[in-house]
Amino acid sequence: MAVSSKHIPAPDLHRVRRALLSVSDKTGLIDFAKALHAQGVEILSTGGTAKSIAAEGIPVKDVSEVTGFPEIMDGRVKTLHPAVHGGLLAVRNDREHVAAMEEHGIGGIDLAVINLYPFEEVRFKGGDYDTTVENIDIGGPAMIRASAKNHAYVATVVDPADYADVVAELEKHAGSLPLAFRKKLAAKAFSRTAAYDAAISNWFAEAINEETPVYRSVAGKLHSVMRYGENPHQTAGFYLTGEKRPGVATATQLQGKQLSYNNINDTDAAFELVAEFDPARTAAVAIIKHANPCGVAEAATIKEAYLKALACDPVSAFGGIVALNKTLDEEAAEEIVKIFTEVIIAPDATEGAQAIVAAKKNLRLLVTGGLPDPRAKGIAAKTVAGGLLVQSRDNGVVDDLDLKVVTKRAPTEAELNDMKFAFRVGKHVKSNAIVYVKDGATVGIGAGQMSRVDSARIAARKAEDAAEAAGLAEPLTKGCVVASDAFFPFADGLLSAVQAGATAVIQPGGSMRDDEVIAAADEHGIAMVMTGMRHFRH
């Protein structure tokens, strides 16, 4: 049953006479406490926060003096007391509330400055179970929710970044805070506790291997506001979840303009793709446009890999995203800056490479310090009208033992290497996906078509265009291998690849007409390998 309201109007300005400070993150704490003291605000505090304030000679009263009860159970119980929550929740214009405060000796609290135990940090650093549980804050969220609910009389501050604004408002309004400002702080406070509880909920689900919990929360903290979203009429913001997976969200931007919404989306796609290739074994480069690869290649050096990737579709690569699985060096940088590029993302960049890229002031250069693990668990989410689709991250990686030769002819070693390369790339191409590969480089990519045969034809045409631009006598699809992200429902898609010049095929299999497709491959002397793993991408 809902609780009814007494409809007591809130004051526009409310004087801050008493503040409660209890923080885990002590950034800016002392200067803020000094400013409050200068405004004549009485400061209550807890544990380490009180000690830090007192050490600077700022008058402070420990909460235990107010409650008449000491901290117990290793600090688990210190603010869970009517003297605290009554002071936060009391409606100051309600006679019954005021009478209760007087009867029980409860003083009002007008400002609650609370930030929480660093649960998210401990979680993503891989803390053990007991340590992570111990960093679940109880009293902090309770005080935040109490004070934010009572924003008519209490201002709630959960972020040190807001200290300066609070001080400015106090100075502007002679020690009072306006209702609109208190509402703004309350909204942020509830967002903070919601995100905190979401992190705890998601961690527990992971801890007990519950993949589809009854309640699923996705939360993040605003990192930056975009100029616009996918299109200029759309608003957008970039939120960080706290996950420490190397990538665009955790990267350091060394130079260039602010990343746009589309830049972030494309850069993430590019870096996740290039991470499929072990830098200890090979150098790899991916060039991305609209979250689809224009070209991907591996080679002995980053420069060579870039040039091979670029050759796949040099027209589409203009204005693209370039991702590397190794350090950006001078030789590669000199080649990349020859055409207009939006973003370069790499684990690192040499000083010489940075100097070369610096000549292109708008070119964004990101370094990540490492590569994401393609096999790591995680979630992927999409919104639909009235709902949220959540699935596990596509972390499937095909190993040699997963491969099954289903044709009369087995692939050669060279074909097999290219097939595995092509299938990894195909995982990152929008479905229906067809990828032609030769000598460790894509030579034609067909993406996002409703018909698999159309994707095969588009990839072949792309290869023909690239060959013509390079002055080659014939497309590089002659003697290539082909990968499909899903099974061939009919033999026509396979026959299109054969017509383009493919000599070997890798695909998941699983069609009702697999036998028909295999027979067509045998008829044309094609080697075919099935993986048993589909990689739809929408």
From Swiss-Prot:
One of its GO terms (biological process) is 'de novo' IMP biosynthetic process. The keyword Hydrolase applies. GO terms for molecular function: IMP cyclohydrolase activity; phosphoribosylaminoimidazolecarboxamide formyltransferase activity. Gene3D superfamilies: 3.40.140.20, Methylglyoxal synthase-like domain. PROSITE patterns: MGS (PS51855). One of its GO terms (cellular component) is cytosol. Residues 6-158 form the MGS-like domain. The keyword Nucleotide-binding does not apply. HAMAP family: PurH. Belongs to the PurH family. This is Bifunctional purine biosynthesis protein PurH.
